[in-house]
């Protein structure tokens, strides 16, 4: 769950929300209140944190926090 903890910290910081509000099942836009600009900035912050590249075509599919965690875990394999 280390990836989740790191993702949670980045999401909380980028969206200026309490980290406790970020759950695996949280939808980034609907549940956490992100807008399209927030999502772009969030993806950039995740790329920097995890030293990965997330193409726009993949970023569109990252709806829930769980999607982000699984995506990053797969990249790190």
UniProtKB/Swiss-Prot annotation:
Q: How is it modified after translation?
A: 4'-phosphopantetheine is transferred from CoA to a specific serine of apo-ACP by AcpS. This modification is essential for activity because fatty acids are bound in thioester linkage to the sulfhydryl of the prosthetic group.
The Carrier domain extends over 1-76
- Subcellular localization: Cytoplasm
| Residue numbers carrying O-(pantetheine 4'-phosphoryl)serine | 36
GO (cellular component) term, any one = membrane
Task: Give the matching PANTHER family.
Answer: ACYL CARRIER PROTEIN, CARRIER DOMAIN-CONTAINING PROTEIN
Instruction: Provide the family line.
Output: Belongs to the acyl carrier protein (ACP) family.
Annotated protein name in UniProt? Acyl carrier protein
Q: Please tell me the species this chain comes from.
A: Campylobacter jejuni subsp. doylei (strain ATCC BAA-1458 / RM4099 / 269.97)
